[in-house]
Amino acid sequence: MIPIQLTVFFMIIYVLESLTIIVQSSLIVAVLGREWLQVRRLMPVDMILISLGISRFCLQWASMLNNFCSYFNLNYVLCNLTITWEFFNILTFWLNSLLTVFYCIKVSSFTHHIFLWLRWRILRLFPWILLGSLMITCVTIIPSAIGNYIQIQLLTMEHLPRNSTVTDKLENFHQYQFQAHTVALVIPFILFLASTIFLMASLTKQIQHHSTGHCNPSMKARFTALRSLAVLFIVFTSYFLTILITIIGTLFDKRCWLWVWEAFVYAFILMHSTSLMLSSPTLKRILKGKC
């Protein structure tokens, strides 16, 4: 059990982190959305960032409401909020992976004909790929939606005698639900890892190939990109591991350590959100023009 003062302190830290992420997400959507209305077209990276901004905005509000309902034992509200959090969490993972795939396809120097064909196809079909990630998220969330419906039904029958056979079947289903959610996060994370490794290998190869021109702007840009990619890799991997531990939910006493853990998790998410803001040339150009 931790002191109430520490609980309040970490609760405030978590709320401040959440509000910062919400403001960042709103800024990304507002700035890039305005640019879209003006020029009537967006680069694929900006399409992903707008989608990520909307997804993360909804995810953060769902997270805040979900955590407060969990802390104050508002079970009926919690069941509906959990499915919302899971949906936007899985969608955010897919969009982050697509962003890395885009950079890998766009920046990598591999010249294999399959890679070149993939580059041509992916860049042409990017809006459909975004729609596909939304559809995949909708499909993977179905077990969680069924599980939440069952949980709501159980809450309405708390006063009735329990059937042990039915209870066992429901526990087995919840195990399957957990496995489905884990797989839904692991697949885009593996995609992120593969794309990041390919991209880092390509940038390292380019740096070694042009090692004589160490001070030219092109080399500096490659070094900066490689350093940024390494930071993104560490932050996103930490984000994935903390979310996975959160889903497992057996490491900590929820009531006791909830706000400490959430403040820790969302510190990584805040760093990741900030790094994404700095990854858009359009966003940086517009914000510099406003300053």
Swiss-Prot record:
Main subcellular location: membrane
InterPro entries recorded: TAS2R
Coiled-coil ranges (or none): none
One BP annotation, GO: G protein-coupled receptor signaling pathway
One GO CC term, this protein: external side of plasma membrane
Molecular-function GO term, any one: bitter taste receptor activity
Known tissue expression: Expressed in a subset of gustducin-positive taste receptor cells of the tongue. Expressed in circumvallate papillae and testis.
Domain of life of the organism encoding this protein: Eukaryota
Membrane topology term: Multi-pass membrane protein
SUPFAM superfamilies from the UniProt entry: Family A G protein-coupled receptor-like (SSF81321)
Keywords, in A-Z order: Cell membrane, G-protein coupled receptor, Glycoprotein, Membrane, Receptor, Sensory transduction, Taste, Transducer, Transmembrane, Transmembrane helix
Further remark: Several bitter taste receptors are expressed in a single taste receptor cell. Confers bitter perception of salicin to non-taster mice.
Family statement: Belongs to the G-protein coupled receptor T2R family.
Protein name per Swiss-Prot or TrEMBL: Taste receptor type 2 member 16
The organism of origin for this protein: Homo sapiens (Human)
